[in-house]
Amino acid sequence: MTGTTRATRRTDSHPDLADPRVGAPFFSTWRVGTPLRQRRSVEAVAAAWERRPWPADDLLGYHVYTGHDASTLLHYSQWTSEQAYEAFARTRRQERVDEIDTAVPDIERLGLTRYRHYRSGGPADRGGRVPGCIVIVDVEFEGPDSARQHAWVDAVFEALAHEPAPHPGGISAHFHLSTDGTRVLNYAEWDSAQSHLDALSAPGDGIGSATALWERVQTWPGLKSTTVSRYDHALGLVPD
């Protein structure tokens, strides 16, 4: 970890999931129980971070999202390396955790998963579109298999390339592979939650049309489960 004296600044800007500097993207989930505790937890995170200097040059950004289930928070941090995160965890993480837990007791932390960014898709020119909803698609496979992770994502991109009726509400999709070889996480940006719901209600299973390519994606050997969750971007923290 490199030393820094930069301040911590709050931002409303969404993160760049495809930033090539991000060598170690981490996702984690907290269960806090109610919309009020969601809001209080977000403010507790902001307070614990903003009162302290930015912890490391190797941390590019930290973002928090409120789940549409009215119970959970998603956390996404952009590290240049796992080693940089480990140094932060040893020396600077606990003081923040303690302050947050004092403000909002009984947070259930459901674990942190380490990923690597693999592929992103979407129009080269977003036309200034700002995401109104973040959709997280969490795919779990039966056991570790890096080749299967890559092949499945490639199959998704092939199905998208031949999609006969792409939904206009989708802005981008950013696929991440867990370092343990068992999961794929798609961080998808949509213009609104309603657009995503409309896409799910269209003919076909999921957001894709009823094509052979999408059926191959959905029946991939070793595919164990798929979970879809919607979030709002609630807090961005970056170095000043």
Language model region names:
Residues 1-76, 80-240:
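Short S/T/G/P-rich N-terminal loop/turn motif that feeds into the first structured element of a domain
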